[in-house]
Amino acid sequence: MTERSELYKKGLEMRKNLRSEAEFQKNASEYAEDPMSQEFIDVVTETVCGGLWSRPGLDVKTRTLICVVSDIATGRYPELEIHLRFALRQGWTEKELTETMFHMSGYVGVPLVREATFVARKVFAEVRAENE
């Protein structure tokens, strides 16, 4: 087995913190299906999760909201689905996330936020069902 850097180890812990155990295992098995995907998630784990998400200065909850906002502003809806789940897991409420989206409509435009609300509605329903 390859010896992993400290950043990789921090990043792996961060990835586990952001997802439920079931989501983490599903995600890990999807990336393990081929070498390119595995190498990609290893790079993301070390650089993004270990290097950025683990930095001091902002708590993880705030970082999840930054990701939600950046996904909406750039129209990255598949990533928005992931980051909304992270945000809910870190304690943001559906109401707070919805209000964030509404507020953004004045700055990034109604069409981007409209699409984001469709994603959010789906994610909110799935997470509520998973928690029942």
What does each model-found stretch correspond to?
Residues 72, 90, 103-110:
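A short structural micro-motif
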Residues 56-61, 91-97:
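Structural motif
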Residues 48, 100-103:
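Short, flexible domain-boundary/linker segments around small modular repeats
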Residues 42-45, 74-81:
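Short acidic alpha-helix initiation/capping motifs at coil-to-helix transition points
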Residues 77-96, 114-118, 123:
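Extended intrinsically disordered, low-complexity coil regions enriched in Ser, Thr, Gly, Ala
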Residues 63-71, 101:
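Short, structured motif recognition centered on aromatic/hydrophobic residues
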